[in-house]
């Protein structure tokens, strides 16, 4: 039986690395696209390359360069394309909105056009990574596939463009093109500037005496958090269906940033006590020293206060459900950060 070939844009990211591992276990031939940059930025996938050199291939490319995308599609001739590449940091999207739109919106269009013009339209299945940030200022709780979009950031707006463009190409050209509307999903591979990883790494450093204080933004923001490893399975399942469609991928459970902080502190055996209200609320340790506080510079120009997904459709049609609880997720992230920090400390000695 011929091996299936997958092409992953965003291979060096959190989702890209987990998806590559998942597909290799299913005996896929996996091709990943990475941008040429001054740093290698392959730490999330180095272990995969060492283990599966014959089935794992890396290529240089860029979503903003239609020529490179066309070349890759025609050269690799994939069965499945996963577009996980993005400028995905919401706060950063306000600073570089033009770049965010070029990558997150026009990048998707470049892939869709590449598939259309490749002569492989009937062969290729396409997955577009959407985000709960498209719902933004939510019009209903929980959010489903039918909930109206109200994005509150250049990132969210760009992803709405990609979502509808994917549907447009599906309906106009009979392309097998699908959207996954993924709610927050975390892991030890999450970037250090994202709030969950910022919390686990920051509190781990405080525990080890490497840092005195953790500064956060809106600790009352509520999110639906799952594990990236669980979510990439859903991405694959979406492309295994008989008909292309769009799915909300979420846990259906919601927690505040403050709740996640408390979970991590408990895992690290750091006793904290919250004092104050609103923006002035702070967490104190046993010695009555402030170790967590808020700063307005980490607030967004337009906040998204509450996101909660309804994964009913995914459960029913994909037979998918998340395996990792918020407690298990926090524990895994904390343990990995402690391991990384300890290893780095030994190297310095």
Question: PLM ranges: what are they?
Answer:
Residues 1-185, 229, 235, 239, ...:
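N-terminal Rossmann-like NAD(P)+-binding domain of SDR-like oxidoreductases, especially those catalyzing
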Residues 19, 25, 32-33, 40, ...:
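C-terminal substrate-binding subdomain of Rossmann-fold SDR/epimerase-dehydratase oxidoreductases
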């Amino acid at each position: 039986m011929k091996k299936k070939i997958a092409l992953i844009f965003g291979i060096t990211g959190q989702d890209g690395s987990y998806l590559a591992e998942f597909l290799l276990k299913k005996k896929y031939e996996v091709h990943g696209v990475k941008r040429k940059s001054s740093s290698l930025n392959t730490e999330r996938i180095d272990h995969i390359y060492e283990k599966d050199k014959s089935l794992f291939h890396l290529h240089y490319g860029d979503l903003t360069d239609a020529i490179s995308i066309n070349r890759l599609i025609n050269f690799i001739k994939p069965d499945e394309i996963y577009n996980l590449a993005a400028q995905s940091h919401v706060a950063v999207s306000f600073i570089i909105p033009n770049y965010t739109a070029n990558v997150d919106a026009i990048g998707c269009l470049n892939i869709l056009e590449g598939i259309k013009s490749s002569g492989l339209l009937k062969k290729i299945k396409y997955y577009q990574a959407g985000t709960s940030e498209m719902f933004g200022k939510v019009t209903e709780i929980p959010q489903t596939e039918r909930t109206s979009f109200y994005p509150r950031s250049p990132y969210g707006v760009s992803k709405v463009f990609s979502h509808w463009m994917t549907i447009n190409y599906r309906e106009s050209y009979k392309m097998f093109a699908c959207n996954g509307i993924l709610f927050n999903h975390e892991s030890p591979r999450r970037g250090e500037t994202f709030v969950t990883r910022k919390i686990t790494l920051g509190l781990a450093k405080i525990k080890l005496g490497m840092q005195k204080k953790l500064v956060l933004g809106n600790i009352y923001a509520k999110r639906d958090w799952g594990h990236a490893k669980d979510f990439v399975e859903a991405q694959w399942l979406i492309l295994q269906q008989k008909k292309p469609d769009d799915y909300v991928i979420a846990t259906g459970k919601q927690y505040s940033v403050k709740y996640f902080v408390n979970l991590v502190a408990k895992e690290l055996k750091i006793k904290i006590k919250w004092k104050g209200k609103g923006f002035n609320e702070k967490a104190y340790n046993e010695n009555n020293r402030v170790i967590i506080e808020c700063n307005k510079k980490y607030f967004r120009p337009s906040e998204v206060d509450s996101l909660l997904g309804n994964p009913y459709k995914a459960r029913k049609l994909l037979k998918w459900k998340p395996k990792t609880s918020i407690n298990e997720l926090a524990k895994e992230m904390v343990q990995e950060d402690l391991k990384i920090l300890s290893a780095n400390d030994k190297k310095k000695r």
